[in-house]
């Protein structure tokens, strides 16, 4: 358990994260949201359970309420030993366990860290990428609704799924999407192939760009809405390519949801054609 058990849950996360030059690219246990940890895969609304952390948005009160509903994503083993070298892969199985101890879902999660190029832009100023590929299977025996605070009634709060929390120094950073939008409010809830955040660093000279690809969300067993973006920069920098931004996924018994996303961490402030060229080079698929 991480931190206060009333706020946090056990889940897989990647932390610490750094750019190739050493600057931080994430934060762990920030004072405003103790359950934010680097780059993590979680889910805010799983029927009445919360596999995200903190309070749950309540349909009746129309605000956040602390409940005894924090679930746990329990690592049960690696399918293969984690690899090293030029490409690092973590291939693991997890069980989603409710606050009452019920086993609701199985997950097969793969993190693949790749494309390290330490000197792409200058000595020590390079990039690297990480992919998430995951399959979530309903083991409960009845349909499970996978949603978000927006599906529960809060506008512009559809965060769920793979979630990045940037360092405090990135508050107020610039953001742009592949569709040409360049404001957090404009991008929030939209569909786009990618979103990019850029900022100067604290502690290190220069700046960087975090490039996030929406990827894919598919299921042969349920209707799946398009991935939409949850983005913020004003109070802090966050990004989530949300599979259930404003529409629930009703995953039937034994049904499986498949997700695939990518982050690229770039030790250079990119914009315009340079950003588009990198986005094309490292696109998914």
Where are these regions (language model features)?
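Beta-strand-rich N-terminal accessory domains
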Residues: 1-40, 147, 266-270, 276, ...
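Acidic (Asp/Glu-rich), glycine- and aromatic
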Residues: 2-18, 123-174, 274
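Extended, loop-rich substrate-binding clefts of extracytoplasmic carbohydrate-active enzymes
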Residues: 31, 35-126
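A short, structured loop/turn motif at beta-sheet edges
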Residues: 78-87, 123-126, 201-206, 217-221, ...
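Beta-strand secondary-structure signal
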Residues: 89-93, 131-133, 163, 258-262
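Beta-strand elements of well-folded, non-transmembrane domains
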Residues: 94-98, 111-120, 136-140, 166-170, ...
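Active-site/ligand-binding surface loops and adjacent short beta/alpha elements
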Residues: 141-220
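Beta-strand-rich recognition/accessory modules
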Residues: 210-285
């Amino acid at each position: 358990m991480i931190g206060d058990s009333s706020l946090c849950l056990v889940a897989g996360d990647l932390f610490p994260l750094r750019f190739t030059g050493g600057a931080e690219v994430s934060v762990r246990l920030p004072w405003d949201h103790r359950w934010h940890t680097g780059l993590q895969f979680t889910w805010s609304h799983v029927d009445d359970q919360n596999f995200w952390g903190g309070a749950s948005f309540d349909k009746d009160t129309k605000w956040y309420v602390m409940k005894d509903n924090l679930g746990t994503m329990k690592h049960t083993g690696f399918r293969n030993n984690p690899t090293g070298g030029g490409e690092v892969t973590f291939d693991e199985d997890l069980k989603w366990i409710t606050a009452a101890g019920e086993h609701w879902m199985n997950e097969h999660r793969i993190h693949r860290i790749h494309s390290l190029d330490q000197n792409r832009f200058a000595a020590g100023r390079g990039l690297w990428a990480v992919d998430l590929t995951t399959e979530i299977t309903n083991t409960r025996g009845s349909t499970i609704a996978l949603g978000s605070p927006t599906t529960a009634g809060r506008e512009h709060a559809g965060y769920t799924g793979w979630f990045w929390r940037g360092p405090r120094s990135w508050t107020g950073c610039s953001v742009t999407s592949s569709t040409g939008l360049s404001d957090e409010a404009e991008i929030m809830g939209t569909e786009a192939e990618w979103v990019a955040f850029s900022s100067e660093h604290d502690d290190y000279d220069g700046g960087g760009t975090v490039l996030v690809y929406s990827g894919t969300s598919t299921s042969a067993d349920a209707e799946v809405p398009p991935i939409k973006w949850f983005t913020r920069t004003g109070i802090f920098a966050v990004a989530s390519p949300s599979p259930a931004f404003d529409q629930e996924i009703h995953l039937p018994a034994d049904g499986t949801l498949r997700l695939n996303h990518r982050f690229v961490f770039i030790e250079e402030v990119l914009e315009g054609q340079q950003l588009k060229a990198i986005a094309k080079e490292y696109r998914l698929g």
